[in-house]
Amino acid sequence: MPHFPNLPLPEAAAAAAHAALLALALLLLLLRSARALASRCASCLKTAPRRAAAVDGGLAAASSVGAWYRAALACCGYALLAQVAALSYEVAVAGSHVAVEALLLPAVQALAWAALLALAMQARAVGWGRFPVLVRVWWVVSFVLCVGIAYDDTRHLMGDDDDDEVDYAHMVANFASAPALGFLCLVGVMGSTGVELEFTDDDSSVHEPLLLGGQRRDADEEPGCLRVTPYGDAGIVSLATLSWLSPLLSVGAQRPLELADIPLMAHKDRAKSCYKAMSSHYERQRMERPGSEPSLAWAILKSFWREAAINGAFAAVNTIVSYVGPYLISYFVDYLSGKIEFPHEGYILASVFFVAKLLETLTARQWYLGVDVMGIHVKSGLTAMVYRKGLRLSNSSRQSHTSGEIVNYMAVDVQRVGDYAWYFHDIWMLPLQIILALAILYKNVGIAMVSTLVATVLSIAASVPVAKLQEHYQDKLMASKDERMRKTSECLKNMRILKLQAWEDRYRLKLEEMRNVECKWLRWALYSQAAVTFVFWSSPIFVAVITFGTCILLGGELTAGGVLSALATFRILQEPLRNFPDLISMIAQTRVSLDRLSHFLQQEELPDDATITVPHGSTDKAININDATFSWNPSSPTPTLSGINLSVVRGMRVAVCGVIGSGKSSLLSSILGEIPKLCGQVRISGSAAYVPQTAWIQSGNIEENILFGSPMDKQRYKRVIEACSLKKDLQLLQYGDQTIIGDRGINLSGGQKQRVQLARALYQDADIYLLDDPFSAVDAHTGSELFREYILTALASKTVIYVTHQIEFLPAADLILVLKDGHITQAGKYDDLLQAGTDFNALVCAHKEAIETMEFSEDSDEDTVSSVPIKRLTPSVSNIDNLKNKVSNNEKPSSTRGIKEKKKKPEERKKKRSVQEEERERGRVSLQVYLSYMGEAYKGTLIPLIILAQTMFQVLQIASNWWMAWANPQTEGDAPKTDSVVLLVVYMSLAFGSSLFVFVRSLLVATFGLATAQKLFVKMLRCVFRAPMSFFDTTPSGRILNRVSVDQSVVDLDIAFRLGGFASTTIQLLGIVAVMSKVTWQVLILIVPMAVACMWMQRYYIASSRELTRILSVQKSPVIHLFSESIAGAATIRGFGQEKRFMKRNLYLLDCFARPLFSSLAAIEWLCLRMELLSTFVFAFCMAILVSFPPGTIEPSMAGLAVTYGLNLNARMSRWILSFCKLENRIISVERIYQYCKLPSEAPLIIENSRPSSSWPENGNIELVDLKVRYKDDLPLVLHGISCIFPGGKKIGIVGRTGSGKSTLIQALFRLIEPTGGKVIIDDVDISRIGLHDLRSRLSIIPQDPTLFEGTIRMNLDPLEECTDQEIWEALEKCQLGEVIRSKDEKLDSPVLENGDNWSVGQRQLIALGRALLKQAKILVLDEATASVDTATDNLIQKIIRSEFKDCTVCTIAHRIPTVIDSDLVLVLSDGKIAEFDTPQRLLEDKSSMFMQLVSEYSTRSSCI
């Protein structure tokens, strides 16, 4: 800083500051000019079009300027005029004898204000949205200096310094400029110029320049494209002041932010870079030390050590400068006592205080932002590693880790490891802080500081058992949370079956029981933390008492300055000591999470050599399996498949058949490499496509599911739609192939999902197609059409292996494999196997028995749809590409209707979605959310008690510090004001009393938080379980899981403590202001405008921060959903070789999540920096006032106490605003939970005054009266006035084409969908007038998709625990599973894995039949219940139903005609209307009936047998 001799210190400081700022402005101007010159030189090498683009990308002229901008210019001009007038007056009065010193200040200020005016005027010309940072800082500094000089001039006028000559001209100019400078200070804080801009492109963002305007979008970037965050390329000043974030906050202050407003992460900060770095270091350890487990912590440290080192440097500087204030307090008190060592000592001390606090503020913000960025890197990299592992898990590993657990690894464990970045440097900072504290204490209390060291070590040692206790509680808490999340995920995925079976209350109670267990461990963890808080709040007091007591016992002399210096040191040391339990707890939590993640990452993967893949065409054998044995459980004595030898020539069609549980699906899995291979070899030639038996559909639209990552080829896409019989379905769907099909394809029927799967496989144009029973879910006509168009035509030149239970599809195969008990018992062509007899003959005979039941005229073929038997079909086309002519010739003008939606405008398509966008509030969080939360537990009575406890703590703390400052002598040699014993006793009483109130407050907050969290969880859970099925159809399960996991965890562990922390910080801040104002009331002059400025900045910040947090919550759901979805479909993803694409998608979603997270964290630091800078200037003002008082005017000990508290003003001020902002951000989780607490509910489960009799329904008579159903109010009717009667005790078959309304009718019967009109009457009871539980518990259903819950066979058959073991065994025997279950070691307690993966689809269906047998309902509904079993098993199930449900009303939806041919009545639906309803015999007599056509199609398809 320049030096100006012979000037009073305030004037000299002002002149020096203006000169320095003017020099900095000129330097930046020169640098910018040089940069512009270099840019122009570089642009000469670019093409003319690029230059033209750069010109076109410029800004238009400002359309208008605001009143504030004009006022700012006027104030600058006014200040310049005042300084010029003062300078002219000095020259005019003194003439040639004028002193240089007298002209120096007005001359420098005149030059400075001229420069400021020029820069401010340039804002309109250049189009700045915000004033440059330097200009704004200049205005603020000028106002502070003006206030300081005005105070000094006031002392002159009051006669404090009679010997000094008063410069009245400068005094008048300074006073006259004060209002203008005050206004400019306010404008500088706000920053906005008020200039409204019109851009030539779509970019409407406002940028904040450093000096001469920020750079707009690069000229070569497309208009409207997302820019990379300027964080990595920002200059030093922009980085130090975090001004690079101001453009985003400016946009957020004008309108709610959207994801598109948030800049992209820099390449080095993206998930891909983090994942590559961590994964490479982790794998390197694995290779270098093959016998030992790699260290995940070491891989993280190796990947990000540079960031950790930079953060460590900032942390070290911050720690050192934070002790400057406590070190200098004793000198400051001595100065106020009259002990002046050198001239201007007071101002120099004040300047050192100010610079130290300034450095502390700047380094803290860089340090905190650095650890935030490092945490994002760690979380992104770890999440990607967990996701990649989830895609590669072997079957045994997959069984030990459910999808819910894997999601929890990502949602909880990865989060904790990332959060540890905040605590990483505390390990070495604590010893450094202790060393610095001991050095200061040695200066003040001498050798007594040894006792400080001992007391500190004892305090730290006391944490060791606490750490073990915390680790134990964390283990238990995480285990219970895993269990709850696993069961929650399972319930959400299977909510339909829970509602159909009236089990939702039972499973909800199970979840609440699990939550109670979780709360037990949570309660212990939080209450133990409250005890730890008491211990560590008491530790600094304990250390202070020991230190002062030892000093007195050793005969040392305590002074007010020494005591205040020690207290300030203890206060700083208190932070790391108070955070030490958090550090211990975080280390314990991180260690647990690292162990869990390491254990997961070490799990066995699918071996790369499970199958040997060679290029297509390199051999004529497409698939070759030699002497192979496979087992899903390698430790089982009985392998799943054994002695498998199979050779498939390229282009061959191979059919696989056999009874349920024979190993058909496992054979396909062995070719894919999914099932562990015990011996032998599997070799495939070329790429493969896999269609599983249970459809796996992503939650995107139909088009995205079919393309599956491949580029769009419109002609090929149309041919695929045609081959998969999807054209009519897409025409019927309101939004065509742009329909969002919901979580797991829930908005499509079973047949539609299967055909979308087939289309996905066909579009990939693979070499080998593995199809697992693809035709079971479609009707006979669609199945026949699919087989002809798909397998015989589109895949004519491909190698196809298809599993089927439908015998009619076997004759067309080149090779038929018959499986039984895991062995290929027969292999050959159809006719050869028929002649051989045995197992294959049994399957065919069962099929013929079913066909023989259909007695109708042989000549009916002539009157129905003609169709060539499949066996005699000779493919006339070689592959899908040859379908082109067929599609083109048959295409009608409406054929593209189903796929034309993509041409509509994005805003139109956004409205046309079957899945709701995630609800997101906008604007401020409602006060009602806070009030509702605070009143949730104990009716809010704990809130005033918490405030009272915190107030008492603050009062007692201030009292204890005041006592020590007052009771001790001011300087050495003065007599003490009280006895040393009284001194210590009073201090200990006050200090320990304050820590006791902290303990009480912590207990109250923990109690309040637990009770509130539990109430909100139960309320949300009950509302979710009572939500209508349409909510689950349109809401991905990952989105709901996000509320019950992430948001609930925030409520459990954070919200209450944020609320308590805000109250605590508010009271502490009021205490600091009270102490400072008591000593120097002049501080209130700046406190009030500072508070106004803080509130304005808080509102400016919170407008963006609130939306960033909401965007963050919304962006979290897709990450969780992709996890769940990918893990469920991992086999399909691997079967298509799509692991890389899904990994890329995961990395993209992680970046979408990281963008708002990074901006949100940076915004916090942006606000904190400005808050702390303001409070630092207030502290400096206070110091300047104190040093300006003549000696003896103020009591030194009280002034020292004010400084001691003032040292914490910046931290408390920023923490106050920050705590409120974080509370507002976190309270969004409460807001999101309340959204789910207000979900629309289904009808009541029980209506007490309208309950049916216990024996209802007695007859099972069902009457449909003008039944009309639509799925949404804005959608067309699905059922159009259905009226018919299903007589009680009769067997009703319900048939129709795909999409005819069969499943909708069943949903209306169970009231999953409430009718739009009409009614359903069962035994004279209108079902709309009784409770849902009364209705659904009296009906029974075997659904199309068999659902098993994780647990045991017993639990799946009898979840309500109403049946005896004997009754369960009888049901198992009747459904032909008794022998299978008895062969298991655990019998009825045999385990069922997630989704029933360890049981075949057919076995799952039989278990569902067992449920129906145990329920013994009078009405039974079968919704495609036998689609996944072979014909023999189908016949068996039908016999069981005829015998066991002979007196029941049985409604059967089926695509297999033999399943319904022996029904008493057949209902034929078409387009939601009744086409026919009569006995099968009468319908068959009418050759033109639709039922006759369906039977004819099925018979024709089967006529080759």
Curated annotation (Swiss-Prot):
Expressing tissues: Expressed in roots, leaf sheaths, leaf blades and developing seeds.
Region (Disordered): 881-919
Predominant localisation class: membrane
EC number: 7.-.-.-
Keyword annotations: ATP-binding, Membrane, Nucleotide-binding, Repeat, Translocase, Transmembrane, Transmembrane helix, Transport
Keyword Glycosyltransferase: no
Alphabetical list of Pfam families matching this protein: ABC_membrane, ABC_tran
UniProt-recorded Gene Ontology molecular function terms: ABC-type transporter activity; ATP binding; ATP hydrolysis activity; ATPase-coupled transmembrane transporter activity
Binding annotation for ATP: 658-665, 1296-1303
BP term (GO), one: transmembrane transport
Localization (cell): Membrane
Keyword check for Iron-sulfur: no
Root EC class: translocase
Cellular component terms (Gene Ontology): membrane
TM ranges: 11-31, 54-68, 71-91, 102-122, 131-151, 171-191, 313-333, 336-356, 367-387, 421-441, 447-467, 534-554, 940-960, 980-1000, 1055-1077, 1081-1103, 1149-1169, 1174-1194
Biased composition (Polar residues): 881-897
Membrane-topology annotation of the record: Multi-pass membrane protein
Stretches assigned to the ABC transporter domain: 623-846, 1262-1496
Gene deletion effect: Strong reduction in seed phytic acid, and strong increase of inorganic phosphate and myo-inositol levels in seeds. Seedling lethality when homozygous.
InterPro entries assigned to the protein according to its UniProt record, in alphabetical order: AAA+_ATPase, ABC1_TM_dom, ABC1_TM_sf, ABC_transporter-like_ATP-bd, ABC_transporter-like_CS, ABC_transporter_C-like, ABCC_6TM_D1, ABCC_6TM_D2
Record field: compositional bias (Basic and acidic residues): 904-919
Record function comment: ABC transporter that may affect phytic acid transport and compartmentalization. May function directly or indirectly in removing phytic acid from the cytosol or in vesicle trafficking. Required for phytic acid accumulation in developing seeds. Phytic acid is the primary storage form of phosphorus in cereal grains and other plant seeds.
Family that this chain belongs to: Belongs to the ABC transporter superfamily. ABCC family. Conjugate transporter (TC 3.A.1.208) subfamily.
Identification of the protein by name: ABC transporter C family member 13
Gene designation per UniProt: ABCC13
